[in-house]
Amino acid sequence: DNQRISVTQRQSVLDALTLRDAGRNAAQIKQVLEEQKMDSSIYITLETLKYLKKGGRITPAAAAIGTVLNLKPVLQIQGEKLDAYSKTRGKKQAKRVMLKAMQNDWENRFAEYVKRGEMCLQSAYTGNEEEALEFKKEIAEAFPGIEIVQNPLSLSVACHIGHGAIAVACSRKVVVD
């Protein structure tokens, strides 16, 4: 269990294939993937608070107030932890916060891996592909020259956060000498 989910888990599968093709056995692949389990970040913002309320993550009162104030939470996933990262007014501000958080991760937390070309960027969404493609363009402007893979969020994530969520993620990728 390398505690990855959705788009960062996709990169883990690609890493496992890279290691397999390089002649590593299952135990070696498992070891590498588990060693790198914390080398990823996901920032997600939601269209609605409805599913957080239904899942018991926020109270009905908080959901009602948040909806009236157009609050968009930015959630962060690192390893197995899902935490509130920020509360913003509107999706535009939420996207700015997510991009700034990702830039901070790249410049600080993952700086050494970025220098060595061991990081990759992902964009993800639930349902609204058109909005997701626009956000991918914003990510590309913030990270010029970096390939960005975009996929729908997994159903296991989507059922908790609802339609209209968008995310930016990064994960360390395996580089075999």
Predicted regions and their residues:
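Mixed-charge interfacial surface used for oligomerization/domain docking
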Residues: 4-177
